[in-house]
From Swiss-Prot:
Annotated coiled-coil segments of the chain: none
Membrane topology per record: Multi-pass membrane protein
Alphabetical keyword list: ATP synthesis, Cell inner membrane, Cell membrane, CF(0), Hydrogen ion transport, Ion transport, Lipid-binding, Membrane, Transmembrane, Transmembrane helix, Transport
Family, as annotated: Belongs to the ATPase C chain family.
Gene Ontology terms: cellular component: plasma membrane; proton-transporting ATP synthase complex; proton-transporting two-sector ATPase complex, proton-transporting domain
A Pfam family it matches: ATP-synt_C
Name by which UniProt lists this protein: ATP synthase subunit c
GO MF term (any one): lipid binding
NCBIfam families documented for this protein: ATP_synt_c
Organism (species): Bacteroides thetaiotaomicron (strain ATCC 29148 / DSM 2079 / JCM 5827 / CCUG 10774 / NCTC 10582 / VPI-5482 / E50)
Gene Ontology BP, a term: proton motive force-driven ATP synthesis
Compartment(s) of residence: Cell inner membrane
Stored InterPro entries: ATP_synth_csu_bac/chlpt, ATP_synth_F0_csu, ATP_synth_F0_csu_DDCD_BS, ATP_synth_F0_csu_sf, ATPase_proteolipid_c-like_dom, F/V-ATP_Csub_sf
Length: 85
């Protein structure tokens, strides 16, 4: 009796964890997209104000975007590990 109840609870928890992993991966990707969009918009605005500093602004923009993508990739990998394990 107790074993069947525990098995049913475990099966339900697996479904919830997979749902949580999928939501987490989606939120990580959405957050990264919004962050990179904000960086791009701000960089274009800064380049429009000071065209002579475009090289430095572009370099900083690429570094910040790469860091955001790295964090997003790590979050997606963790969510995939939760999903499949």
């Amino acid at each position: 009796m107790l074993l069947s109840v525990l098995l049913q609870a475990t099966a339900a928890a697996v479904g919830v964890s997979k749902l949580g992993a999928a939501i987490g991966a989606g939120l990580a990707v959405i957050g990264a997209g919004l962050g990179i969009g904000k960086i791009g918009g701000s960089a274009m605005e800064a380049i429009a104000r000071q065209p002579e500093a475009s090289g430095d602004i572009r370099m900083n923009m690429i570094i910040a975007a790469a860091l955001i993508e790295g964090v997003a990739l790590l979050a997606v990998v963790v969510c995939l590990l939760v999903f499949f394990l």
